[in-house]
């Protein structure tokens, strides 16, 4: 079924307020979740609300966080987020990074002790809309076997990038460092669909197509994805003095406790390196040239990274956002959550 962006936003916001989140914070979380669903990233959209509601109601997401911004240098800062909702903390951290980069050319802002922040391309697009280049990366709970390994160590540790072209054009790139994000498995479960056997392994280490049998995810491109997730864990965890590797908290164990996750934003002002106008012209030229490339057999069009999601987002603004009926029924119900997510860590060793 399809519903309007405004309706979905209000339903999510109301449910999170029902769980105890203040209206301002609930609106921000809803904004990021609706953004994800509108772009077809259903793994990071409304499917997450029931889990968020349970964690908020049990105190694992701080309803009254005390944010503290520590400016550690002219271009660097740490936002101590007090286990606030991750979307709220990440958006706030990016706002500071944008101001710093506008003045000083570059900014590096770490967000320390936060919750799950959802689709992190939302935050790099904040920078791009301000005419800046945005890069963001964050930790995730352990659910991935390292290349060549049989035990879980790292999370999906996503990485996102966005840069402005001419007008309102934005080039966006957002990826998990696994073949697919855990949320894609959750989405497959909600739709009763199988998954490709290249995404994950079962408890015996064998490839599986059953999303309910997933025990561990696989790194993207083997050793390359493994190296990227290691780098992201270092920059968003070790660098900020936070738990790292398999010490990162599980999304599903003890929903009464804060996640203590880390995220790192890097923002670059093109005007400090060349000309913002020239940069934007060349980026738009890149996008047009990629679209003009002859497609390979089996493809109708070459898209630049993120273009397919841009198209879906524009369509959603007109046609509405696709949502699974079970999720819609939950959102309009009085239930805070139907099935507890606590202690259901599918990656427990």
From Swiss-Prot:
The record marks 48 as: Plays a crucial role in stabilizing the binding of (S)-ureidoglycolate. The active site is at 116 (proton acceptor). Keywords: Cytoplasm, NAD, Oxidoreductase, Purine metabolism. Its main location: cytoplasm. Pathway: Nitrogen metabolism; (S)-allantoin degradation; oxalurate from (S)-ureidoglycolate: step 1/1. One of its GO terms (biological process) is allantoin catabolic process. One of its GO terms (molecular function) is oxidoreductase activity. GO terms for cellular component: cytoplasm. Induction: By glyoxylate and allantoin under anaerobic conditions. It is found in: Cytoplasm. NAD(+) binds at residues 140, 174-176, 224, 306-308. It is an enzyme of class 1 (oxidoreductase). This is Ureidoglycolate dehydrogenase (NAD(+)). It comes from Escherichia coli O157:H7. The lineage of its organism: Bacteria, Pseudomonadati, Pseudomonadota, Gammaproteobacteria, Enterobacterales.
């Amino acid at each position: 079924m399809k519903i309007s962006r405004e309706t979905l936003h209000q339903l999510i916001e109301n449910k999170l307020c029902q769980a105890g989140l203040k209206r301002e914070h609930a609106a921000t979380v809803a904004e990021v979740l609706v953004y994800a669903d509108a772009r077809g990233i259903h793994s990071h959209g409304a499917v997450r609300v029931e889990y968020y509601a349970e964690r908020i109601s049990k105190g694992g997401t701080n309803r009254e966080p005390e944010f503290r911004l520590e400016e550690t240098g002219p271009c660097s800062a740490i936002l101590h987020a007090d286990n606030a909702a991750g979307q709220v903390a990440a958006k706030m951290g990016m706002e500071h990074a944008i101001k710093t980069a506008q003045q000083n050319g570059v900014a590096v802002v770490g967000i320390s002790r936060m919750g799950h922040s959802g689709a992190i391309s939302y935050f790099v697009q904040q920078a791009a809309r301000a005419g800046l280049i945005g890069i963001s990366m964050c930790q995730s709970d352990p659910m991935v076997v390292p290349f060549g390994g049989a035990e879980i160590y790292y999370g999906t540790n996503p990485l996102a990038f966005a840069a402005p072209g001419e007008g309102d054009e934005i080039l966006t790139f957002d990826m998990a460092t696994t073949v697919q994000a855990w949320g894609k498995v959750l989405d497959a479960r909600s739709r009763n669909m199988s998954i490709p056997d290249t995404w994950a392994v079962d408890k015996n280490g064998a490839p599986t197509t059953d999303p309910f049998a997933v025990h561990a995810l696989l790194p993207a491109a083997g050793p390359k994805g493994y190296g990227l997730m290691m780098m992201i864990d270092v920059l968003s965890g070790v660098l900020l003095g936070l738990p790292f590797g398999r010490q990162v908290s599980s999304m599903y164990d003890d929903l009464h406790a804060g996640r203590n996750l880390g995220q790192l934003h890097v923002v670059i002002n093109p005007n400090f390196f060349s000309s913002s106008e020239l940069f934007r012209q060349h980026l738009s030229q890149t996008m047009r040239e990629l679209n003009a490339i002859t497609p390979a057999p089996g493809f109708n069009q070459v898209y630049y990274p993120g273009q397919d999601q841009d198209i879906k987002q524009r369509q959603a603004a007109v046609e509405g956002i696709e949502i699974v009926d079970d999720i819609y029924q939950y959102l309009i119900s009085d239930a805070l959550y139907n099935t507890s997510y606590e202690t259901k860590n599918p990656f427990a060793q």
